[in-house]
Swiss-Prot record:
Record protein name field: Leucine--tRNA ligase
GO biological process terms on file: leucyl-tRNA aminoacylation
Keyword Transmembrane: no
Subcellular location: Cytoplasm
Taxonomic source organism: Histophilus somni (strain 2336) (Haemophilus somnus)
Motif segment ('KMSKS' region): 619-623
A GO MF term: aminoacyl-tRNA deacylase activity
Length: 860
């Protein structure tokens, strides 16, 4: 064993061994319990960032721990390779997106290997390869045949700069999330998958996920947005038109004072034909797109249409307004407004001097000042004919029944969830497998014509998708007829919705999945990824699993039993202001700091002498130039140090603050471990441990070892509090460093302890542990060594060391049976020669006993 810890030498050797032995290759074994651990695969952007490193370290720790516990572990890796950034990079670097993507994959794959992650590379998936998306295209055609896919013209958020459709979530304050260009509204035909057909299942099956974070489940519940209410039809006065609204508060029906419709509602567009002012308002409202989250805070604007609706119970004429807070694609595109009992309706009514009619009063009969705000709680019904005096439930049911009876209403369950628009007007995505015939009929591309391959050798001009710009690409035939291929491509969430399943049979060519393999490995036992995916990827992931189940590929209802959402990685961010008043962000690696006695930064200067402003710890990002390159850290400290810091610095779900001092601390700890094994190896134990022949000190140390094993096993296995597991090992290491190695049983206890520490640390720091395991004389590799088990007997305290004091000074230490009483301990203490000496001539006035630790005499 070499004296110095040299991660640069060890890590390369160990990684070479793993690659040659295919240590992490997963093979189906019906006689072995499987464990499928999956981290969300990365977009191949060019370089790994610390967020990736954290995600994959957590997954690797869990995988290695489960393998040591005898499970047949599958931990695959691949690349979510389609997407917009590749097009931007291709234009900037004058290359093709495919070339840029494949080069990035090669580079990032090497980065993952250098970090020592135990992936089964034989299962690697790259989603932009035709052999992968062929089956996605085929599955889409099957969904179309089942009636789960349709095409419709829909209003979309259009970014004129990127020339693409944006999801509502990608619109930030009216601008594109990527380039801030003002977003416009545009009507285009698009393909949709009917996720709404699965809304109820997606909602109720959340109860099958006890090991998913509550926060994610709450976000999905809110996103699906199930509500029970009544759909009500109003007649439009002096016409044969009707207007349908949906309400969850039929108890307020007698309080309706106006109706509001979306700018794109046919009724509004009709009314605007002879009203240029209204037409201008509608045009403005249509092109001021807001994300749904911003509806509550934006300024409410509206204009009267001049039309009136008739209240079906009171006969009252209610003005119909166009309002910017009503969305065409939610509900019916029209709402009944009750200003007395809805704050948004109230603000609008105040602004445009519309009346309000209170129909609910507080249940405790307290007064409510309607001149200040709406009363939005449930209460007792008033001013509502025969429903006066009833509570919420009775009024809800009474009015709903009456509306149904007179034929203008029906009870209905509604969902906020909308069907999934999967069309993208970009090039770098999987082509949508639909064909249009000369007569306008739309048909699915037959299996023998799949995959419809995206040409990779293209030139990007930054304006139009190459497959849209080339009229030849779309030309094809269908049963001898001339046909045109669809030139839109799939939303990249399509690829990431089923990749987890394809990992189970990645080379299978007969079908989308090999059911035998798939049902052995699925569901995923542990999924790891960021909470920012809660309502998009994680919902589509669950939806696709149900589609695969209904197509007969999988038997489970849910794709993953357990979900861990790791926190973000933060780092200090620094900037100075340039002469042109621009903030210039400086990398933390180029900053010299001065701190006060509490460790707070009081001065920061960069390499060029600029005094910097410290803007605090923020998420590592390119924009703030505060990303730390994992590669540099691995070269400086070794992969094990980086992994140890990542797992120790913070609980997995919390944000992690990158501190190089903490990385240095992790490195020092590994050096201490190395030095301790080296020291022990100079004179190792020659005989086996004999638990019956141990001294009190040896038993106490062994007890600490086994208590640590029990804690670490629980922390990693059940609680997933990896940082507390590491803290416990560090605490044990402090005791081991001070332990004696003077006799054979000392060394035997140390041998057991070091073998345990190395096994406990192996999932976290596998390279150093691989080497130390060999240096401790173990024949086989540690990769399949069983996890260390705590010995219950070793943890039992049969004896205690009690300190004896006389007038506050230690005069003796006695070892007594653990169950000895206070009186018996007093007698043992008084029998001690040194205690007798210091009590001689004094009278004991008081005794103090701290059970199992201290016995103190106060004497005068």
């Amino acid at each position: 064993m070499q004296e110095q810890y040299r991660p640069d030498l060890i890590e390369a050797d160990v990684q070479k061994y793993w690659a040659e032995k295919k240590t992490f290759k997963a093979v189906k074994d019906p006689f072995k319990e499987k464990y499928y651990c999956l981290s969300m695969f990365p977009y191949p952007s060019g370089r790994l960032h610390m967020g990736h490193v954290r995600n994959y370290t957590i997954g690797d720790v869990i995988s290695r721990y489960q393998r040591m516990n005898g499970k047949n572990v599958l931990q695959p890796m691949g690349w979510d390779a389609f997407g917009l950034p590749a097009e931007g990079a291709a234009i900037k670097n004058k290359t093709a997106p495919a070339k840029w993507t494949y080069e990035n994959i090669e580079y990032m794959k090497n980065q993952l290997k250098v970090l020592g992650f135990g992936f089964d590379w034989d299962r690697e998936i790259t989603t932009c390869k035709p052999e992968y998306y062929k089956w996605e295209q085929w599955f889409f055609t099957e969904l179309y045949k089942k009636g789960l896919v349709y095409k419709k013209t829909s209003t979309v958020n259009w970014c004129p700069n990127d020339e693409t459709v944006l999801a509502n979530e990608q619109v930030h304050e009216g601008g594109c999330w990527r380039c801030d260009t003002p977003v416009e509204q545009k009507e285009i035909p698009q393909w949709f998958i009917k996720i709404t057909d699965y809304a109820e299942q997606l909602l109720s099956d959340l109860d099958q996920l006890p090991e998913w974070p509550d926060m994610v489940k709450t976000m999905q519940r809110n996103w699906i947005g199930r509500s029970e209410g009544v759909e009500i039809t109003f007649n439009v006065a002096h016409s044969d038109q009707t207007l349908t609204v949906y309400t969850t508060r039929p108890d307020t029906f007698y309080g309706v004072s106006y109706l509001a419709v979306a700018a794109a509602h046919p009724l509004a567009e009709n009314a605007a034909k002879n009203n240029p002012e209204l037409a201008a308002f509608i045009h403005e409202a249509k092109n001021t797109k807001v994300a749904e989250a911003e509806l509550a805070t934006m300024e409410k604007k509206g204009m009267a249409t001049g039309l009136y609706a008739v209240h079906p119970m009171t006969g009252k004429q209610l003005p119909i307004w166009v309002a910017n807070f009503v969305l065409m694609h939610y509900g019916t595109g029209a709402v009944m407004a009750v200003p007395a009992h809805d704050q948004r309706d109230y603000e609008f009514a105040q602004k445009y001097q519309l009346p309000l009619f209170p129909v609910i009063k507080p249940a405790d009969n307290s007064a409510w000042d309607f001149s200040k705000q709406a009363y939005t709680e449930h209460g007792i019904t008033i001013n509502s004919a025969e429903f006066d005096g009833l509570d919420f439930e009775a009024t809800f049911n009474g009015i709903a029944d009456k509306l149904e009876k007179i034929g203008v209403g029906k009870r209905q369950v509604n969902y906020r969830l909308r069907d999934w628009g999967v069309s993208r007007q970009r090039y770098w995505g999987a082509p949508i497998p639909m064909l249009t015939l000369e007569n306008g009929d739309v048909v699915v591309a037959p299996l023998q014509d799949l995959p419809i391959v995206l040409p990779e050798d293209v030139v990007m001009d930054g304006v139009k998708s190459p497959i849209k710009a080339d009229p030849e690409w779309a030309k094809t035939t269908y049963n001898g007829q001339v046909a045109l291929k669809e030139t839109d491509t799939f939303d990249t969430f399509m690829e990431s919705s089923w990749y987890y399943a394809r990992y189970t049979s990645p080379q299978y060519q007969q079908a989308m999945l090999d059911a035998d393999e798939t049902n052995y490995w699925l569901p995923v036992d542990q999924y790891i990824g960021g909470i920012e995916h809660a309502t998009m990827h994680l919902l589509y992931f669950r939806f696709f699993h149900k589609l695969l189940r209904d197509a007969g590929f999988v038997t489970s209802d849910e794709p993953s039993k357990k979900l861990l959402c790791q926190g973000m990685v933060l780092a200090d961010a620094f900037y100075y202001t340039s002469p042109t008043n621009e903030r210039i962000w400086v990398s933390p690696t180029k900053v010299t700091l001065e701190r006060d006695e509490k460790g707070r930064i009081i001065k920061a200067v960069d390499d060029e002498g600029h005094e910097l402003v410290h803007s605090g710890m923020t998420k590592m990002s390119k924009s703030k130039n505060n990303g730390i390159d994992p590669q540099e850290m691995v070269e400086k400290y070794g992969a094990d140090t980086v992994r140890l810091f990542m797992m120790f610095a913070s609980p997995a779900e919390m944000t992690l603050e990158w501190q190089e001092s903490g990385v240095e601390g992790a490195n020092r700890f590994l050096r201490r471990l190395w030095n301790l094994v080296f020291e022990y190896n100079q004179n190792p134990a020659q005989t086996a441990l004999d638990p019956t022949a141990l001294s009190v000190e040896q038993k106490a140390l062994r007890r600490e070892v086994h208590k640590t094993i029990a804690k670490v096993s629980d922390d990693i296995g059940r609680r997933q509090t990896f940082n507390t597991a590491i803290a416990a090992i560090m605490e044990l290491m402090n005791k081991l460093t001070k332990a004696s190695l003077s006799n054979e049983q000392d060394r035997a206890v140390m041998a057991e302890a070091l073998n345990a520490v190395v096994r406990m640390l192996y999932p976290i720091t596998p390279h150093i542990c691989f080497q130390l395991w060999q240096d401790l004389g173990n024949e086989s590799a540690i990769d399949f060594a069983p996890w260390v088990i705590a010995d219950a007997e070793a943890m039992v305290e049969d004896e205690k060391l009690v300190v004896i004091q006389v007038n506050g000074k230690v005069r003796a230490k006695v070892t007594v049976p653990a169950d000895m009483s206070e009186d018996e301990i007093k007698q043992v203490a008084l029998a001690e020669e040194n205690v007798q000496k210091f009590l001689n001539g004094l009278t004991v006035v008081k005794t103090i006993y701290v059970p199992g630790k201290l016995f103190s005499f106060v004497a005068k």
